[in-house]
């Protein structure tokens, strides 16, 4: 029996992540200047950044049904304490301190959370090898 096209479909790569914003200019400044993300381009009502090969799109919700709190976006960093200190120096409002989430067989998982200029929850994560 031959596999159908639907049997072969697998979502295995994120191409773009959208984050709803109320004030696009303020959000662009925050993601570019405060978080240090690489700005790609802007079109009316939308701005795009590169995040390690995944495109991040900022803009107002296209339709009312899309205007809802989003998922937590986690940025993977090599040194969570150094990144925390650097962003705190840029007045990022952290909700907590870097803390251990889980001990895995070969690494420890650390996280810390903050809100962006639009109130979206963001996180930093670091897998610290032992």
Where are these regions (language model features)?
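Amphipathic alpha-helical segments
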Residues: 25-38
């Amino acid at each position: 029996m031959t596999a159908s096209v639907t049997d072969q479909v697998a979502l295995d790569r994120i191409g773009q992540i959208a984050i709803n914003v109320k004030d696009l200019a303020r959000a662009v400044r925050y993601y570019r200047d405060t978080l240090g993300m690489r700005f790609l381009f802007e079109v009316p009502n939308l701005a795009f950044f590169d995040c390690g090969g995944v495109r991040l799109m900022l803009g107002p919700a296209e339709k009312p049904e899309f205007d809802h709190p989003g998922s937590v976006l986690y940025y993977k960093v090599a040194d969570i304490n150094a990144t925390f200190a650097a962003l705190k120096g840029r007045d990022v409002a952290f909700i907590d301190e870097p803390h251990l989430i889980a001990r895995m067989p070969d690494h420890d998982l650390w996280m810390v959370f903050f809100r962006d200029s639009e109130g979206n929850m963001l996180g930093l994560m670091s897998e610290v090898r032992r």
